[in-house]
């Protein structure tokens, strides 16, 4: 079938398998052209491995450090008449390119919050890898079924303690509009912490440790975003921020557990990028459109692969890591450069419907958004007939 982008709200409901493969290849080429990661990981588990930062971590470990990788994700395969999810095609492409390099790559499809998927992962590590020396936690999910209670909990994107009104960008209608959000209830805050906080990361590390599949010296990191003043009301000081603060608490006990075997645990702070998750946050499209313009002008613009490759090379496995006073690894320092933030803040209230394309890089934002789904990739013929039924040879599908 011939597949064209169809966007509804902050989701593109179609995906392009050839475009997704080309996007993965571009990221691999970036890593291989920038050289190996010295003393990098060799056997890596990535939880949330199919898109965005998790996919970039899997690519960086495999092609920057020659690592065998096991990826966990929750994606949907395509059929002859309907495309699958982008994460499915990304993972199929990753496994194909890893196999060409002689690297081990297997994937587990299922609910990473569940005990079942944790057990299947442990069994696969024991059978295929023995032990892992890096665990990357990169889950973004709107809800979680708690494995112990069976309760399904939802996360909420709301301010805490006060209603907030801010400028946003309606990406469908391409207009600037005021957005007002009522404060989260305590139940909504607790739910967001349960879905997006550190409990599941801790459950993973506890399960892996008890099963004896963490190598001596094993490291783990969970990805987070802090942002700057302009996003704080809705992000760091909001319900999501409460979940992110929970990561900062949970990492301490995880670090103690791994330190007993010479290992380490860190929260890693990454810059704002276009992802399916960030495009759902009302103020992020406008912030990102301004940020892209400023960072491209200063030559510091980065996407997922540049961020995560740099994180592994400089901080997780580098001699002089970028660490803040909380002990987090920082890869967001170019975004938080005061000169960059001052320019974004200065333009924030000046953007109008009429000057949107001149004052911001909304065009670049839209391109990055479509690239998530395999569109707008250079060299791909989007008028060609493609088969959306793409297999992942090494898949262990717990959903069937």
Swiss-Prot record:
Q: Which GO terms describe its biological process?
A: fatty acid biosynthetic process
Q: Name one GO molecular function term.
A: NAD binding
Q: Where is this site: Plays an important role in discriminating NADH against NADPH?
A: 75
Q: What keywords are assigned to this protein?
A: Fatty acid biosynthesis, Fatty acid metabolism, Lipid biosynthesis, Lipid metabolism, NAD, Oxidoreductase
List of catalytic residues: 235 (proton donor)
Q: Which EC number(s) are documented for this chain? A: 1.3.1.9
Q: Binding of substrate: at which residues?
A: 225
Q: In which pathway does it act?
A: Lipid metabolism; fatty acid biosynthesis
Keyword Nuclease appears in the UniProt entry:
no
Asked whether the UniProt record includes Lipid metabolism among its keywords, one would answer yes
InterPro entries per UniProt: Eno_Rdtase_FAD-bd_dom, Enoyl-CoA_Rdtase_cat_dom, FabV-like_NADH_b, Trans-2-enoyl-CoA_reductase
Residues reported in the UniProt entry to bind NAD(+): 48-53, 74-75, 111-112, 139-140, 244, 273-275
Q: Which Pfam families match?
A: Eno-Rase_FAD_bd, Eno-Rase_NADH_b, Enoyl_reductase
Q: Which reaction does it catalyse?
A: a 2,3-saturated acyl-[ACP] + NAD(+) = a (2E)-enoyl-[ACP] + NADH + H(+)
Quaternary structure and partners: Monomer.
User: What protein family is recorded?
Assistant: Belongs to the TER reductase family.
Q: What does this protein do?
A: Involved in the final reduction of the elongation cycle of fatty acid synthesis (FAS II). Catalyzes the reduction of a carbon-carbon double bond in an enoyl moiety that is covalently linked to an acyl carrier protein (ACP).
Q: Which NCBIfam families match?
A: EnoyACPredFabV, PRK13656.1
| Descriptive protein name | Enoyl-[acyl-carrier-protein] reductase [NADH]
Species of the source: Burkholderia cenocepacia (strain HI2424)
Q: Which gene encodes it?
A: fabV
């Amino acid at each position: 079938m011939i597949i064209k982008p169809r966007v509804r709200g902050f989701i593109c409901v179609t995906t392009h398998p050839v475009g997704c493969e080309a996007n993965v290849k571009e990221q691999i080429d970036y890593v291989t052209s920038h050289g190996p990661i010295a003393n990098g990981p060799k056997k890596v588990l990535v939880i949330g491995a199919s898109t965005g930062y998790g996919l970039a971590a899997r690519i960086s470990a495999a092609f920057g450090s020659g690592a065998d990788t096991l990826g966990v994700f929750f994606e949907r395969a395509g059929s002859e008449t309907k495309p699958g999810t982008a994460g499915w095609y990304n993972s199929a492409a990753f496994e194909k390119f890893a196999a060409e390099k002689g690297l081990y790559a297997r994937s587990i499809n299922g609910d990473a919050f569940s005990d079942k998927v944790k057990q299947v992962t442990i069994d696969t590590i024991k059978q295929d890898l023995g032990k892992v020396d890096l665990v990357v936690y990169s889950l973004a999910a709107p809800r979680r079924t708690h494995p112990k209670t069976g309760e399904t909990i939802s996360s909420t994107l709301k301010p805490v303690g006060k209603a907030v009104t801010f400028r946003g960008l309606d990406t469908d209608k391409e207009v600037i509009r005021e957005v007002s959000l009522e404060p989260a209830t305590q139940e909504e805050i607790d739910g967001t912490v349960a879905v997006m906080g550190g409990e599941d990361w801790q459950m993973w590390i506890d399960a892996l440790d008890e099963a004896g599949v963490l190598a001596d010296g094993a490291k783990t990191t969970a990805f987070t975003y802090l942002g700057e003043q302009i996003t704080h009301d809705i992000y760091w000081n909001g319900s999501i921020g409460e979940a992110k603060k929970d990561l900062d608490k949970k990492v301490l006990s995880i670090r103690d557990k791994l330190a007993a075997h010479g290992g380490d645990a860190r929260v890693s702070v990454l810059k704002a990028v276009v992802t399916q998750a960030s495009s759902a946050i009302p103020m992020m499209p406008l912030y990102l459109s301004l940020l892209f313009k400023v960072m491209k002008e200063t030559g510091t613009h980065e996407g997922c692969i540049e961020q995560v490759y740099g994180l592994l090379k400089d901080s997780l496995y580098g001699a002089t890591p970028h660490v803040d006073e909380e002990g987090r690894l920082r890869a967001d320092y170019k975004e938080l450069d005061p000169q960059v933030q001052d320019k974004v803040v200065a333009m924030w209230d000046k953007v109008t419907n009429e000057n949107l394309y001149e004052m911001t890089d909304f065009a670049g934002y839209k391109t990055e958004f479509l690239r998530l789904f395999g569109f707008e990739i250079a060299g791909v013929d989007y008028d060609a007939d493609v088969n959306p039924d793409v297999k992942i040879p090494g898949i262990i599908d717990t959903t069937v």
